[in-house]
């Protein structure tokens, strides 16, 4: 297993390992630049097929061929796809998450950032799977633009990206429902997060929530065809991106 990760404490990975080893009440404290502290149970990363949101189940149904699961967490999607007979490579930047996936039986696991040159070692994939607001892995608008180009080196001919994201503009609504944010400032969907577990605080990281119109603009500018497969009443959506 090759790695390309920082030396910062792996709060997410440690929480998942704790759950995997029997501490079923393990929870992460998540701080962000847009909302107050949130509590994220480690159990959420271990959900079964029927505990997954409908949008995630739809994404699994739409997978085809060789799958690269990016930001795979504890491996719930990779394990489900394995059960269905898919060949899956699961990747996460968290060493603890990778260890959990190995313990749970994900057959092919690697510890990488999504931009690592060694991510696929030249292999091409039919499906790039990016769930749990997976577009966020790209971090920023610049990162999104960079990833859309990078993904072209990962996709086999006829391949697809299946990804979820959300429009978080509702966080900026005033009491009358009007949007209030600085049009000259950073894109409102760019968020900074920090995760805490036990006595560990992970390094701050950037995450992007791309509204559908923005995602479509960036993807089409990069040469992708865009198909929105599903949206829900919480402004989350599932999108398929393909190259001609």
Residue ranges and their predicted role:
Residues 64-73:
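Conserved class I S-adenosyl-L-methionine
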Residues 74-85:
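Conserved SAM-binding loop of SAM-dependent methyltransferases across substrates and taxa
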Residues 105-116:
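Conserved SAM-binding strand-loop segment of SAM-dependent methyltransferases
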Residues 125-145:
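A short SAM/SAH-binding and catalytic strip from SAM-dependent methyltransferases
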């Amino acid at each position: 297993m090759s790695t390309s990760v920082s030396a910062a404490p792996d709060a997410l990975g440690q929480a998942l390992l704790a759950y995997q080893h029997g501490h079923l009440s393990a929870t992460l404290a998540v701080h962000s630049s847009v909302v107050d502290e949130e509590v994220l149970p480690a159990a959420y990363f271990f959900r079964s097929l029927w505990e997954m949101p409908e949008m995630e189940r739809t994404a699994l149904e739409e997978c085809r061929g060789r799958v690269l699961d990016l930001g795979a967490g504890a491996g719930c999607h990779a394990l489900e796809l394995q059960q269905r007979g898919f060949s899956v490579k699961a990747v996460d930047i968290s060493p603890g998450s990778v260890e959990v996936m190995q313990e749970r039986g994900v057959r092919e696991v690697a510890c990488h950032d999504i931009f690592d040159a060694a991510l696929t070692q030249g292999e091409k994939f039919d499906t790039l799977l990016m769930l749990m607001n997976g577009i966020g892995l790209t971090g920023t608008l610049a990162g999104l633009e960079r990833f859309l180009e990078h993904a072209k080196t990962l996709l086999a001919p006829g391949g697809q990206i299946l990804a979820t994201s959300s429009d978080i503009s509702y966080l900026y609504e005033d009491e009358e429902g009007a949007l209030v944010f600085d049009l000259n400032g950073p894109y409102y969907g760019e968020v900074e997060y920090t995760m805490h577990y036990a006595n560990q605080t992970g390094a701050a990281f950037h995450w992007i929530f791309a509204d559908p119109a923005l995602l479509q603009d960036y993807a089409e500018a990069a040469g992708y065809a865009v198909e929105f497969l599903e949206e829900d009443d919480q402004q989350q959506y599932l999108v398929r991106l393909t190259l001609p």
